[in-house]
Curated annotation (Swiss-Prot):
Substrate binds at H101, R102, K117, K124, K125, E126. It comes from Drosophila virilis (Fruit fly). This protein is produced by a bicistronic gene which also produces the small subunit (Mocs2A). Its EC number is 2.8.1.12. This is Molybdopterin synthase catalytic subunit. GO terms for cellular component: ATAC complex; cytosol; molybdopterin synthase complex; polytene chromosome.
Length: 345
């Protein structure tokens, strides 16, 4: 028989023993999880447990089912977990099993402990002697990456040393002209917006789907108490290796929405091709263009000067659409472009 329960009071060990005893069983394995008084040099005074009780009980029942599939000889299974404040040295969780032989009892309890930590929605907070607010702790058995405080810190510039120092940078080469506080505000707003978008998409992408008639005919309570942590269903999208939907985005902002953008772009990107071997073979002019390509991170397109200039133009248009501040840099490029056209004519 399976005995699962969430308690707000102390767990009675004698009751657990009575639930396990059976005349056909020769082994009882019991695990008791207690509150220790220290963690990484801090004095712990208590643990506080919270749970999504409906889902927790369902997952505990599924664990019992998995145990009986793996070890059919199990007679009784007990999973008790205490909620609320648990002082030091008191029992917070009990996992026990009885079987005719000790191997099944010992192995099943060990397996159940790991499954309880990784699957059941129960959260633990450690309350310290000098920090009564406490700190929520994640189980190492959880499949997702562990939370790290360093992930929320600002970028540490000292970790990336720059040997070359540039002084007296012209203002026209600076794309974003704001102070550090404004820049940090923009970054935080961007991260917050992306986090909200991800949370919104997760609501649609990670949800319980009715895969059979039993789920379809189930009561509303079954759908109400669904949890993405344990009942997520990913549906692979067509022509994609992921569950994410691929959408075509329409950009309604940028230089391409300006009046006469196409004609202006054609003027910049089209030019008459003059066959001039002396120009193509000129090391001086070629080196000047190569320097611009290296600065703009553009791949050189052979010896065709016009195609190389067109690639640089496309890169500048891309940067201008990404960052509005980059439009101040366009005037410099136009001057360089006109110099090459005049030298080619």
């Amino acid at each position: 028989m399976d005995h699962i329960q969430l308690l707000n009071d102390k767990i009675d060990i004698n009751l657990i023993h009575q639930l396990l005893i059976d005349q056909s069983c020769g082994a009882c394995s019991v695990f008791l999880g207690t509150t220790r008084d220290n963690f990484e040099g801090k004095n712990v005074i208590s643990l506080e447990y919270e749970a999504y009780e409906n889902m927790a009980l369902k997952e505990m029942g599924k664990i019992c089912t998995d145990l009986r599939v793996r070890w059919p000889s199990l007679k009784h299974i007990v999973i008790y977990h205490r909620l609320g404040i648990v002082p030091v040295s008191e029992v917070s969780v009990v996992i026990a099993a009885s079987a005719p032989h000790r191997v099944a009892a010992l192995e099943s309890v060990n397996f159940a402990i790991d499954q309880l930590k990784s699957r059941v929605p129960i959260w633990k907070k450690e309350v310290y002697e000098k920090d009564l607010i406490g700190e929520w702790k994640a189980n190492v058995e959880c499949p997702w990456p562990q939370y790290s405080k360093t992930s929320l810190r600002t970028f540490e510039f000292f970790s990336c040393k720059i040997d070359q120092k540039t002084e007296n940078i012209p203002d026209k080469l600076v794309q974003i002209r704001v102070d550090d506080s404004e820049l940090n505000r923009r970054v935080k707003c961007f991260l917050k917006r992306k986090r909200d978008e991800i949370n919104l998409y997760n609501i649609h992408d990670f949800k319980q789907l009715s895969t059979n008639t039993e789920l379809a005919d189930s009561s509303e309570s079954e759908v109400k108490y669904s949890c993405a942590r344990t009942q997520s269903s990913l549906v692979k999208q067509q022509q994609s290796k992921s569950h994410l939907k691929v959408r075509r985005e329409i950009d309604n902002s940028g230089p391409h929405v300006r009046p006469n953008y196409s004609s202006q772009l054609n003027k910049l990107t089209t030019a008459q091709h003059y066959k001039n071997d002396s120009f193509e073979n000129s090391m001086l002019r070629n080196s000047r263009l190569r320097n611009i390509e290296e600065y703009m991170c553009v791949t050189s397109d052979g010896d065709n000067i016009l195609n190389r200039i067109k690639n640089i133009e496309n890169k500048i248009l891309l940067l201008e659409s990404i960052s509005p501040e980059y439009k101040y840099f366009v005037s410099i490029f136009i001057i360089v472009y006109q110099m090459f056209i005049l030298s080619n004519s």
